[in-house]
Every structure is written in C-alpha cells, then in structure tokens.
Amino acid sequence: IRAGATGTKIYGASVDLTGLHMASDIDFNRKSFTTGHTGFGVPYATDPDHSDVPRSAARALRYMDNYLIVQQGEVFYITEALSILEGMERGPAGNTSLTAAFALAQELDEDQIIVVQETEYTGAGKHPLAQLSFAESMGIELKFGDPKLDKPGVNIIFPEHPSQIKATYFDMNRLKHSYIKNAVKHVNATKATKEDVKFLMEETKMDKDFVLRVLEELNIEII
C-alpha cells in the first residue's frame, strides 16, 4: 500500500480443520497440521488481541481482501509435487499458501502475477509420509478422490488430478462481524464514539454503514 500498489489484492490462506478442537487431545492426534490452519487463522483474525501481548500488530482484517481455505489432501499433494519437481522437501504446513496460490492461479489471467509468502516456517510439520503414517494409525482414512469431500479428523483425500485443487473463499463479512463483536466484548462496551467507529472501519476495512449496522445489532449506542 505504501509503495502505491493499490491494485494489488492480499489473500490469506489456511488449511481447513473445521470441527477439530485445538485444545482436545483426541482431536489433536487426528489433525495432520499443527499450524497454518483455520483453528488459528479464524480466531486470530477475529480477535487479534487475545494473544500474549497487550496489543497485537498482526491485524489481518486491516489488509486482507480474501481468505482462501484449502484441504489437507490438497496441501499434501502440492508438498509432494514441490519435492518431485523442484527437489524442495518441506512442510506440509509450510506449503499452505503455495497450495492456495496454485488454486488461485487457475482463476486468473495468464499475465497476472501471484507473490507467495509463507507466514508459517517452511519446515512446519514432520515429513509428510511420517504424518500420513501416523494419521492412518489414528484411524484416518487416506484415499484419492475429490478433495472437497475431505473431512478433518475422519479422512484425508488427495486429488486425482491437480485441476481438482480449488480454494474455497471464506465469508469475509462473517469474519468482520465477529471481529466487531469481539471488540465490543473486550471492553464490555455499551456505547461507541465517532473515534471508535472510525477505528472499527480501519480494523475491518469496511465502510461506516457496515460498522454502524453491526453495532446496532449488538445494541451499542453511538454517541
């Protein structure tokens, strides 16, 4: 933005682990990603200040235009492809953004450019085969098919063809609504000033009408 790249879109990306509780020992052993997943991405996007600092600088909704969700099997597939094609064996959590970019590239014009940055450490996770062996020992079904039928904690479905790798777009308005709800809860707010409204507009990258509508739903008085 500061460099004047106002036409550039910023995408976030996570592996879909919907339904698995991050604090559950049983669920923990049924997920093949301990980072780079929705169990971190969604809570920290909608409530950035619940981390171990008074005010977090990582405020994703200020900048993120879209949030792409990919499946476990898709990331394992891209991890193996990267290993075979480029000789780079890492991840799989460190290939989350690359998988989302691969899916996104299928939607864009051929002259458009995607810059991929893995915010997770690129060696995140054990060797893919070790992780898959452990998953199988925990009763997770491993198979090839439609990765969109992947159910976290139940199966891992690898695509039969790379064209099957398609990212899902998370509902950004839902994230932003949750952010405002959490911000209100943090300070037990019953009223909001013009400065508060301006702050929430900047935090959610939304217009005044959206912020006022959500605050009204939460019974917050504007003063």
Specify the residue positions occupied by each region the protein language model found.
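Buried hydrophobic packing segments
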Residues: I1, T79, S97-A105
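Conserved, well-ordered active-site substructure
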Residues: I113-V116, K126-L132
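Flexible, glycine/charged-enriched surface loops at secondary-structure junctions
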Residues: E86-S97, E110-I113
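Flexible loop/turn segments at secondary-structure boundaries
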Residues: T18-M22, L98-T99, T122-K126
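Short beta-strand segments
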Residues: Y11-S14, V115-T119
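Glycine-rich phosphate/diphosphate-binding loops that line cofactor/substrate pockets in enzymes
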Residues: L104-Q112, N188-A192
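Active-site/ligand-binding loops adjacent to catalytic centers
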Residues: A3-E89, Q131-E217
